[in-house]
Amino acid sequence: MTIDYKKTLNLLDTSFPMRGDLARREPAMLKAWQERNLYRKIRAISQGRPKFILHDGPPYANGDIHIGHAVNKILKDIIIKSKTLSGFDAPYVPGWDCHGLPIEHQIEKKYGKHLPADQVRKLCRAFAQEQIDRQKADFMRLGVLGDWEHPYLTMNYAIEAGIIRALGKIFRNGHLYQGQKPVNWCIDCGSALAEAEVEYENKRSPAIDVGFEIIGRKDVCHPLAGVMAAEIPAGTRIFAVIWTTTPWTLPANQAVCVHPEFDYSLVSTSRGWLLLASELTNACLARYQLEGRVVATCKGLALEGLSLQHPFADRIVKVICGRHVTLEAGTGLVHTAPAHGLDDYFIGQQYGLPSDSPVKGDGKFSEQISLVGGMFVWKANDVVIDTLRSSGHLLHAEEIEHSYPHCWRHKTPIIFRATPQWFIGMQRQTAESQSFGESLRDLALRAVELTRFYPAWGRARLEAMIGNRPDWCISRQRNWGVPMTFFIHKEAHTLHPRTPELLEKVAGLVEQQGIEAWFSLDATELLGEEAQHYQKLTDTLDVWFDSGTTHETVLKQNIQLRHPADLYLEGSDQHRGWFQSSLLTGCAIDGCAPYTALLTHGFVVDGQGYKMSKSKGNVIAPQKIADTLGADILRLWVASTDYSGELSISDEILKRTVETYRRIRNTLRFLLANLADFNLAADALPPAEWVEIDRYMLAYTAALQNDLLGFYERYEFHQAVARLHHFCSEDLGGFYLDILKDRLYTSMANGIPRRSAQNALYHIVHSLVRLFAPVLSFTAEEVWQELGESAEDSVFLHTWHCFPDQSEILSDAQILIPRWQRLRELRARVLKQLEDARIQGEIGSSLAAIVEIHAAGEDFALLDSLGDDLRFVLITSEVHLQRVDDAAGEVIRVTASPHMKCERCWHYRQDVGSVPEHSSLCSRCVSNLAGSGEYRRFA
């Protein structure tokens, strides 16, 4: 009877499929997680563990999620899961930012701008909830585990009340004041904008040089004659020349500013005498196409107080001094309109200049303003320029392209406009201050010093922003927002003396009824007869205040969480957004940051490094990736990319990610298949009885796990994925598993050589499945179920794998890792010779070869120590080893084996057919099949 020896091999199978089919399998796994209430189970088993709190920066509840949202949520999920596996209680409470103009704008687009305010708020609330539901489903589809049933929403009544209470604390600590200052103003929004709501884009603007005539009397010496010690003929007209890219602001001009320490030249030209900064004189004359002669020079300080005639308004303005003046462009003399610029405002305060804005909120000049009354600001540019040209005050006009602030929502240029607003002061504190004895800026800068940054360059960036930022304008003139619940005296324009008490009473009402409680409130309910002297403030809070105070409204209120958080994680734009607003409110309330560490990730760009935009057609939606390739592919791409810079994505990049995933999946499948008949309880062996290469790989895997825990701890996920991929493809696939196949397939099923291998594979796969779980969450769960655990169990209910006999592993690591590292190097040299022989047609496969190795010294001793097991390491049928005196004599020769091929193990051996009953087998296979089985010590 002919024996089918293939059936005698240990060729096991697994239900873990080769193809992931992730797009189909993942939704079913999500459903199972929800039905088993996995997140709640994680919380239950984590009770009593040390906490790790990653506080979710709330995305805005408007529109579908994009690839940047996916990157952000996946990074957070990787951290939460790795911390859970590390033995922390790491809850994740997702949140949404719900108030603000973008949502209100959507309602206006759909219903028009004339709805009653209460109806607008009602529609905004409903719209925000719809957007949250859509975004939530998309985030969950990415495999992000969290308290999705109880997210925090800034429009929740309790949080709206908490925001008002946070405002009260900042007020009590003396950081809040009302002032009329220039703020970023969006004409389309009809409201002030926060710094974080401003984007800089290129804009073409008129750049003009304008002469302000220095006033002198014809019958007396010109005032500049004494200042500059110059002879100035009677009747000479002298112009102080300014340069500006905003001609429309000239109606608001109140002064011309010079730097007190710069040199200024009086220059005689055919257009009159001009006053210019000395360093810029030649450039200015070239621009004006004029010849000129410098008559005299002086320091800017000497010019202070000179009177100038406004070029078209009926008023006299003064020369003032300011250190914000630069010589980078222009003339060195700065047109100063305190209503339209912060530098102008601050210097104007020093000189008592008015800062009333002639421009209304709709971008039009007040009717009473001469020349441009009722005109839109951008149209006023041409009128101003034509007027200056006609009057002879225009020395030059051109159009330039420069970086200019735009509204982040409307993508339109903004203006700077002085309006009565409420500010959180960076330097000042009110007389009622109960704060920490330092300015808010100093508190914030000290808090930055105490914060850890990932990557490290984030510290300098945030420090620079805090060091240079103006006071924070927190008031807005919109409907859909948390109201600034202040009562203002109608005549004195001061806050009610019982403001802290009133704020708490209003917060109590809002907690029950939402923000509508304030808007519908009759002041007499709280003020009684005093109500006739007070009016309710109708301004709402900047939405950055909403999200910036979640450390008060969420971290301190949710019993799952803790203040301060261990980590805030957002995109790099949040240095001027949520990171900063949270820092400022945290310092204003508690004197410290609400976080101990900040992690910043870059923006997503296409394969060529271009920003994604619908107009370019290079947008890749995360929903499409999940629905076609699977969320685990998206997660693997995120984790594989160094998030500290830009993250590139394209179809080609995703294709490479899929290939990486396949290699990992195939490795896992091999491990699972070869553990199909393994039961740890029955088949466990103490490592001392294992084959040496198995002990080596156990020690190597333990060292790998230790390294990866470090990568996870330092948030270096791309390093972790690179190491894991290399481990699967090179350490396992290219080395260990390649060697192991012979022993797994041909040794006795219950023999020590095979069980030794399976013991090692058991620990390797249990380590790997956990190490991959934070990244490949769906695949890790699929592997976990295949390992035979309970259907109710999950990899996320466990911690990192605990290896057996830790002390023995450590000892093995010190000895076996360097020993086998050298063996792997020598093996690589032999494999190259085998491959060359195969390419040249000398052999068919490595098993058809005899390898002759001449080695010297320690290398000979190392190879010789393996005995006959060396052939299994080299995956060849026969090895002849010979000692030589030195490296010069070392050689590797490959020849074709003259022996017969064993039908079962495919080795070419001299003893094939030595047992008549199994005439096509080698003696090793006969022993494994019908005898006591082979013995392996090393491989």
Curated annotation (Swiss-Prot):
Keywords attached to this entry: Aminoacyl-tRNA synthetase, ATP-binding, Cytoplasm, Ligase, Metal-binding, Nucleotide-binding, Protein biosynthesis, Zinc
Leading EC class: ligase
Main subcellular localisation: cytoplasm
Keyword S-adenosyl-L-methionine listed: no
InterPro entries listed in its UniProt record: aa-tRNA-synth_I_CS (IPR001412), aa-tRNA-synth_Ia (IPR002300), Anticodon_Ile_BEm (IPR033708), Ile-tRNA-ligase (IPR002301), Ile-tRNA-ligase_type1 (IPR023585), Ile-tRNA_ligase (IPR050081), M/V/L/I-tRNA-synth_anticd-bd (IPR013155), Rossmann-like_a/b/a_fold (IPR014729)
Catalysed reaction, written as an equation: tRNA(Ile) + L-isoleucine + ATP = L-isoleucyl-tRNA(Ile) + AMP + diphosphate
Annotated motif 'KMSKS' region, positions: 611-615
Residues involved in L-isoleucyl-5'-AMP binding: 570
Superkingdom, natural source: Bacteria
GO molecular-function term, one example from the UniProt record: zinc ion binding
Motif ('HIGH' region): 59-69
This enzyme's EC code(s): 6.1.1.5
Required cofactor(s): Zn(2+)
Gene Ontology CC terms, in alphabetical order: cytosol
Positions of Zn(2+) binding: 902, 905, 922, 925
Matches recorded under PROSITE patterns: AA_TRNA_LIGASE_I
Free-text note regarding domains: IleRS has two distinct active sites: one for aminoacylation and one for editing. The misactivated valine is translocated from the active site to the editing site, which sterically excludes the correctly activated isoleucine. The single editing site contains two valyl binding pockets, one specific for each substrate (Val-AMP or Val-tRNA(Ile)).
Quaternary structure, from the entry: Monomer.
Sequence similarity: Belongs to the class-I aminoacyl-tRNA synthetase family. IleS type 1 subfamily.
Task of the protein: Catalyzes the attachment of isoleucine to tRNA(Ile). As IleRS can inadvertently accommodate and process structurally similar amino acids such as valine, to avoid such errors it has two additional distinct tRNA(Ile)-dependent editing activities. One activity is designated as 'pretransfer' editing and involves the hydrolysis of activated Val-AMP. The other activity is designated 'posttransfer' editing and involves deacylation of mischarged Val-tRNA(Ile).
Name of this protein: Isoleucine--tRNA ligase
Lineage: Bacteria, Pseudomonadati, Pseudomonadota, Betaproteobacteria, Nitrosomonadales
Encoding gene, per UniProt annotation: ileS
